[in-house]
Amino acid sequence: MAKKPAPTEKRIVLPGVSWQQFETLLDELGQNRTARLTYDRGKLEMMTPLEEHERCSRLIESLMLVVADEMEVQINAIGSVLLKRADLGCVAQPDASYYLTEKIRLPNRAELDLNQTPPPDIAVEVAITKSSLNRFAIYAALGLPEVWQYWTTIGDHVLKGNLLIYQLQNGQYVQCLNSPTFPFLPAKRVLEFLDQSDKIGLAQALTVFRSWIQEQRSLNT
């Protein structure tokens, strides 16, 4: 019996889309849309994420919340919010974004105008298929200071991917071994957590990870 092909993320690219047309499309799709949108000066890409995509994003968020809790840092997890700069003609929609401040006031909607609101401190992108647009050029234009990009594949090895952490420096992204926001946290430790969550379960993996953070803090005091 022939093996059923694995599902894959679908990306649709539309050229020649004006900003006004893009805004009209946003209104038509509504705030409960499932597609991830990327827009770069007339080119629009729409991608519908698979469940594996969302699973990775949720696991990384659970890790991020533990880090903030242990470091006693206020964190605002705003999910997959659309980040816009109309003056630049740029829009990106990371899988998750985080503000590490209690002072920020966010509008109650599924998009942020970065001319009115500062960009999130950390953005997370899960990459299963490659975008046809230069997303990092868009992230740089939007001024996102730190981006985590988790590359993986569909199937049993979805939690055995590769995490790349980037910091914006002079308009360009530079790869870092550790998170610039949390210097004690290397990308490889995040990968270990993802692997452990698959092997021993999320609750136990979070307990192990929390203990590890506490050890790192004690070493630096």
PLM feature segments, named:
Residues 1-221:
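Gly/Pro/Ser/Thr-rich low-complexity, intrinsically disordered segments predominantly at protein N-termini
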